[in-house]
């Protein structure tokens, strides 16, 4: 059939006894089982098509017990994870050569956009250091090979979703902060480099 418009929109449905029922607020659903105070957890506002979606990124860094360290990712590109680990090692001095690294996007969602990078990097660093991230902070940003945090698209849409889900702070690229319309009651933490982000939350 002929199709007009974007074809990459996400719909979330729940199977009930009378059939499928749309989930009106999938972000709340994906965060409903989030555990507070645990290291290796970061919340990101991603875009699926034009829809903002809040999801939890979970990381577990453990001592490698079987020789070559493993790099396993569910819901996020494994090669992108390896790239971010290399940036953390080269630019921030973190060491993963003796560690297995496991990454999971909670809720079975697959995240492909670069704006998820910062959440992945912070979740991994949090698990390595065993220091929980602030549960009231959501993050968004692309990480460059030099450790810089690059601007992302539709930042105001993301901030609105972050505020609606009850978060108090949003860590965003500094390049997105100029002239930004911020929802009332939401504190913005602009960062230019990955080192700044790590200093703020780890």
What are these regions (language model features)?
Residues 1-202:
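Peripheral, non-AAA+ core regions of ATP-driven protein-machinery
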């Amino acid at each position: 059939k002929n199709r007009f418009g974007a074809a990459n929109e996400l719909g979330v449905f729940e199977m009930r006894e009378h059939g499928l029922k749309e989930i009106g607020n999938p972000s709340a659903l994906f965060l409903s089982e989030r555990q507070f105070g645990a290291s290796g957890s970061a919340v990101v506002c991603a875009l699926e098509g034009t829809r903002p979606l809040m999801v939890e990124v979970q990381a577990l860094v453990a001592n490698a017990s079987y020789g070559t360290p493993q790099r396993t990712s569910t819901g996020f590109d494994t090669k992108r994870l390896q790239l971010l680990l290399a940036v953390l090692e080269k630019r921030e001095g973190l060491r993963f050569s003796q560690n297995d690294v496991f990454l999971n996007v909670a809720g079975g969602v697959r995240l492909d956009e670069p704006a998820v990078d910062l959440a992945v990097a912070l979740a991994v660093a949090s698990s390595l250091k065993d220091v929980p991230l602030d549960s009231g902070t959501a993050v968004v940003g692309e990480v460059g090979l030099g450790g810089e945090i690059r601007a992302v698209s539709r930042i105001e849409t993301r901030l609105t979703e972050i505020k609606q889900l009850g978060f108090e702070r949003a860590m965003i690229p500094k390049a997105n902060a100029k002239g930004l319309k911020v929802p009332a009651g939401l504190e913005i933490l602009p960062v230019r480099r990955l080192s700044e982000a790590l200093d703020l939350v780890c």
